[in-house]
Amino acid sequence: MEAHGHFDIWVDNKVVLARLRGSWNQEMAQRYADDFKQVAQPFINGRWAHIVYLDDWELGTPEFESVIAELVTWVIDNGLKRTAQVYSPSMLKQYQMDKLVKESINDFERRVFREESEAFEWLSHEGYPVQRALLHPMSA
């Protein structure tokens, strides 16, 4: 089956940034998981963070959830400590994200922000500053 949806993913300092767009199926989720793992390789067994932009994301099919759930386990097992999700209030997005990613597990913490600046401020306060001038996304 053809992948549906799009993403940009890039790294800045010890932060993996991603922008998701469109409605996602299992194939797009797998492509994202594979690219995410590749980009995160330099941080494995260290402490790192993630920020994801979800305003243009239109949710995922039920089949996509198992792929993302496996990715969530992988990132936490490999040193992810903070995740900032950026999107305007949406009960559907919140439901799907809450289903896939717990708010906290051991020393991992996830927070949701309306504004990018709030997410950057929180990550910086937590020890993960982002230099916006260094954003180099790779797209799918």
How would you describe each model-predicted region?
Residues M1-A140:
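Amphipathic, Lys/Arg-enriched alpha-helical "gate/interface" segment within cytosolic domains
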